[in-house]
Amino acid sequence: MTKVLEVIYGFGYGGIRAFIMNYLNFLDKDKFKVDIYVFGYESSPFTDKVKELGANIFFEPENNAAKKPWLFVKQLEKFMKGHGPYDVVHANTNLISAWVLLAAKRANVPVRLAHSHSASHFGESWKQNLYSYLRRFMIDRLATKKLACGQLAGETMYGKNAKFEIIANGISLDRFMYRNEKRIEELKHKFNIPNGAKIYANVTRMDPQKNHLFAIEVFREIHKIDPKAIFLYGGVTPKISPTVEVVKAKIAEYGLTDYCRYTGPVMDVEQLYHMTDLWIYCSAYEGLPFGPIELQAASIPVIASDVITDEIDLGLGLVHFLSLNDNPKKWAELAVCIQKKQIPSDIIIKAFQKYNFDIRQGVKKLEAIYEGN
């Protein structure tokens, strides 16, 4: 049996956690035993689910990767030697992967995988750029294989001429295509949604990256056109994040409190998708986000910022791109014109298979990589 260690910062409601859980659901349990090492947090709402899927999850509350990388490497190496031996270490930690892979090398792990999940730029000052270069150099030397969620994410982390393999953010279509009318009505009641109101949403991690303030500017313009419209926002909040209070203050400043709903984390986000009419996905940067992919499986339209890779568009006519340089009024005018429509399930399935976003396709590729192929 191949023993795999997944390394990740936090295990909340974000996309990297979703990636691990999605693949964990479909990995061959007779061939692979998975442990998950979570640093920077001491718990997760998904602990029980991880255990149900036959995996173990371990927490290191300290996050020494940024300021004390030598201590981080020492702690992780000790863990690997104490809980291994591991055949595979899969670093889902962007540039922090340099330190994860160093620990894996010192622990004699034969298959060492770096995985880019983001297309963010990793530094602005010359010191930050130099530090990023050092970690990229280490990853290049220490990784036995480099992975990425998409072309843009791979080029951003490894370089345009680097060799890497794409592991798509595959999803289970059955989960997102299924519409549960009873649960949708429960959610409408929970969030006090008036009958007939058109629902717009940006329920993503409360982080500046997700650009909630711009989404509020867009909804402000939508409200001028459609005074009955409702806006949902929220999602998981990092330990230290002023974003929630800043967004709530802006909503109050614009007099929109009665028309905006803070959801907090939502476990069955697929039914929240089905409840809504359109999503405003105005991130400042992304790798290849799960949200727009999942929304297309649910047949929900999306307006996305053009900094997001066009790899998210599966050709179903549901994704519309606008620039963050366009004024919010332009976003709002497009939003109110887009009508929700149900795409036939067979067409959705074909599109997901064509672009390799069906989890059953991706898991075969990942299993081969875990086996050293």
Segments and roles (model prediction):
Residues 14-22, 198, 202-221, 245:
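A conserved mid-protein helix/loop that constitutes part of the nucleotide-sugar donor-binding site
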Residues 36-44, 171, 203, 230-245:
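Glycosyltransferase donor-sugar binding loop
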Residues 38, 301-306, 311:
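Short hydrophobic beta-strand element within catalytic cores of glycosyltransferases
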Residues 64-71, 155-158, 170-190, 195-196, ...:
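Acidic anion/phosphate-binding donor-loop and adjacent secondary structure
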Residues 91-97, 116:
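Short His-centered aromatic/hydrophobic patch
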Residues 244-264:
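Nucleotide-activated donor-binding/catalytic signature segment of Leloir-type glycosyltransferases, i.e.
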